[in-house]
Each structure stands twice: as structure tokens, then as C-alpha cells.
Amino acid sequence: HLSIRRQRQMCIRDREYTGALFVFTKCDAEDYQAFVLNSEEDIDQFLDAFGISPTETNQLIDAGRVQEETQERIAIQEFIAGLTVDFPLSEEMSAAARDIQNRVYDHLEFIRTNPDRKIIDWTNTEYALFRAIEHARYGDAIARGFTSVDEFITMANMVLNRRKSRAGKSLEHHLSAIFDGNEIIYTAQAVTEGNKKPDFIFPSQASYHDMTFPTERLISLAAKTTCKDRWRQVINEADRLRDRPKYLCTLQQGISPAQMDEMQSENVILVVPRQYITSYPADRQDRIWTLSKFVSYVREVEGL
């Protein structure tokens, strides 16, 4: 290790160090260490190891965040190393992502106190996990290249179809975990009239089909990662609730004013993580429910 004074002289006076990465770390109250990484390979390895993008240099690094993200990558690689199949089932993938996120970042209390943040955190971890598995399974094949256009298309279709399938189920799995953590009673993929299947019926499928059960105590929720065009599917998923609000949880950031007006006319209420609501038309944001508000509403209706 070089002294701070020597490092400063080297970085300022020697042109060969222009563009080098200077890393200055605090060891304790009195001692510091400084490093100069001058090759692209060394710089890339450092940034990759700590999950730092090139745009995040020239500033203080949150050591706690770096440590957590490094732990997350290690946990993901350990999970992949233990797999006995190419890709786990969607439910297993989501559960693994929640387990990794909960272990690394903690804050299990957010399931109750801040479900809006928790569901985004789980979703982000699952996305990172899925990408890591894709890289482990397909990285070498892609690096080698393809012998024909057909071979490339076959690979691309396989990857895209798996991505679509995972994304469609991921939100449902994480919502189930939020509901379980809040002791909410529900049936996932309940069967209603004409074999229709809303994603969630509260409190249960049995209650829905019990004509003596009060309609005002029934709630339906659809889960769609994106809903720009498919939101109309939720309108007729439960005949008993045709004149009641239909709730639609989505991770889509932003919908046009015209579509929001159409949703309102069909009595569809959007449920969106709080962090995403600002991406919606400002004069219509008051129509949107946060996930926290929806959870509180269901708990109230169920008398919890």
C-alpha cells in the first residue's frame, strides 16, 4: 500500500494515471488506505465485485449497500450451484428469491409495515436470480455463436417464452406471500362461473359460491405485471362481483389518462406499489390504491 501523500502525487502528476480508479477507504478513526487501479481489467473487476456501475464513481460508496449486494450475488450463485434442474418451477424461483432477499436485507417487518416496498424488493431479487440462471445455462452457448438462423431463433424463442411465463406468475407468488404474512384468508386461482379464474378471491372460493355469504364481503384481485391492454380481462372474471369494484394489482409504471378513465367507468381500481404511483397521470393518482391500502382494506373486511 502506498501512502496517501504518494498516491496523491502519483494521480496528479503522472499522466499515465489519467483515467485510473482511485479508491480511498477508511479503516478506523485514524487510518486510511488508498489504491490506484490503472488497467481496465482491474477497474472492471473492482466495479463488478462490488456491484458498482461506472456512473457511480466519483462519489462516496455506501459500504453497507455494497456488502448486501455482494452477499446477494453470493447467495444467488449458491442457489444455482445447488440446482438439479435447468430451471426451477416458477413458484420455487419466487420462493428462493424471497428467501435470499429476506436473509440478505432482512426487514421481514416490511411484509406488514411496508408491503409496497417489500414486493418490489422481492421482484428485483427474483429478476436478478433469473438473469443469473439464464447466464449460467445459456451464456456459453451464446458466446460460441450459432451455426444457423434457425438455431438462433429456437434459442431466442425458448428464452423469451420462459421469461414471459416467469414474469406472469412472479407477481402472483409474491402477492400470496404478502397476504400470508398479513394472515389474510384467500383462494388463489379460484374457479368462478364458466370456469373463469380470477387470480385471488377473498376470503375463499367456497365463500364465493355460497349464495348466503354477503356479496359485500367478497373481494377479487387480478395480478398483471403489465396491464396496458389486458386489464379488460378482469371485468368479467367474477359474476357475483359485476357491480362491485374489481381490483387489479400491477407493476406497470404509467397508464394513459384515457385508459384510466375507461377503468374507472368499468369500476376497476388499480393497486400499485407506492413508489410507482408518481408515474401515473397526476390528476388521476388519487384513484390508485397502494398495496398497503389494499391489504388494510382486506384485513378490515375479513375482521382481522
Please provide the spans of the model-predicted regions:
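Single conserved hydrophobic/aromatic residue that forms the stacking wall/gate
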Residues: 1-4, 8, 12
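Conserved catalytic cores of phosphodiester-cleaving nucleases, focusing on short active-site segments
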Residues: 179, 200-225, 234-236
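Acidic-basic catalytic patches of nuclease active cores, encompassing PD-(D/E)XK
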Residues: 148-196
